[in-house]
């Protein structure tokens, strides 16, 4: 027992020199100094932007046909396929027998941006745009209604159509 205690309390001159001269501290400062003058890899986000992937999935939008009629046929496939249950759809039958949505809501606080809604849509009505920067000060600000989604689609239709055309050969 005494031998174990003596072995743990032995202190060599080499250990004393390392602790007295702060060798580990100097090594750490030298490493920091080497990296201090290298090219920076950090991006200062609001001022600098990195390129987005062509398949980036951002803010949702509802599209219209060229004649102004909304594309959604109320098939509710996107609502059924959504793993986060973020989409709510209500529909009515029109006088001509076709269905159209009366309510199309997406709760972006639930949405995981998987893109299943876009993939399942048979008429390319719901799409995910390249819009990365959107925010809300209250929880309700991230609850997008049909009118809000149509407004996003109307505003960015040219970019959405170009992205769809560029990605068509991969689908």
Curated annotation (Swiss-Prot):
It is a peripheral membrane protein. It catalyses: a quinone + NADH + 5 H(+)(in) = a quinol + NAD(+) + 4 H(+)(out). The keyword Cell wall biogenesis/degradation does not apply. Its cofactor is [4Fe-4S] cluster. GO terms for molecular function: 4 iron, 4 sulfur cluster binding; iron ion binding; NADH:ubiquinone reductase (non-electrogenic) activity; quinone binding. [4Fe-4S] cluster 1 binds at residues 72, 75, 78, 121. Pfam families: Fer4_7. This is NADH-quinone oxidoreductase subunit I. It comes from Paracidovorax citrulli (strain AAC00-1) (Acidovorax citrulli).
